[in-house]
Each structure stands twice: as C-alpha cells, then as structure tokens.
Amino acid sequence: MRWTHLLLPAILLLPAMLGIASPACAHAFLLHASPPVGSELPVSPSAVTITYTEGVEPDFSSIEVDNAQGSRVDKADPHLLNGDQTKLSVSLPKLPPGEYTVVWHVTSVDTHKTEGRFTFSVTP
C-alpha cells in the first residue's frame, strides 16, 4: 500500500513533467493586424482585420474603429473572415485623412476574454 502513496503523485504530475499544456490556459491575443499596428496608409482601408493566436467567438467579440474625436466610424459588422475563427474583421467606409484607434474585445473559443487597442493613420 505504501507504494501507491508514491505512485499516485507521480501519475498526477506526469503531464506537467512532459510539458503537456492544457488548452484551457490559452487566450486569443493579437497576432497580426491589417492595417498593421501604427501604420500610415496613403489610402483608406476597406476593413480592419485582426488575426488572433486562437479562435474567437464572433457573437461575443467586437472590433470598433474610432476617429481622433472618439466617434465610431466602422460599419459595426464584425464577422469572421472567410469562416476562419482566428480572423475577425469589420468593414470601413472611405475614411478621410487622420488618426484612427482600433479597440477590440474578444472571447476565445475556450471562453477567455482579451482586449487591446492600436492606431493607424490615413495620410493626405
């Protein structure tokens, strides 16, 4: 019976010792943005698309684009790009020159919530 006291902890610790990570520990972070973070564009983009490190739930996620005065300028239509759960996109009207702030909030497929913001500019 004494050997079971030693064996049980070893069995329970085996996944950690092998480096097996639980998928529940993951979060959806910004991997890539189009337009790129901090970019200066000569023309207005037609959309903002963010690629995340894992899939997101579009019904519980958002991307908002605000102008320098803080007014929302996107078309309020966040959607998965081509059905890819890692790519959330929002359409834009033709934007005048200026600086824009992208604010995003996502819930990943494992229900973790993350958020962030970045800017881009449309130059005259």
Task: Write out the residue ranges for each language-model feature.
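N-terminal signal peptide c-region/cleavage motif recognized by signal peptidases
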Residues: 21-23
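Bacterial N-terminal signal peptides
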Residues: 9-19
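Short strand-edge motifs at loop-to-beta-strand transitions and within beta-strands
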Residues: 86-90
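Short, surface-exposed alpha-helix to beta-strand junction/turn motifs within ectodomains of secreted
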Residues: 48-50, 54-76
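A glycine-anchored, Pro-Gly-centered beta-turn/N-cap motif
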Residues: 91, 96-105
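Extended, polar beta-sheet/loop recognition surfaces of beta-rich domains
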Residues: 47, 51-54, 111-124
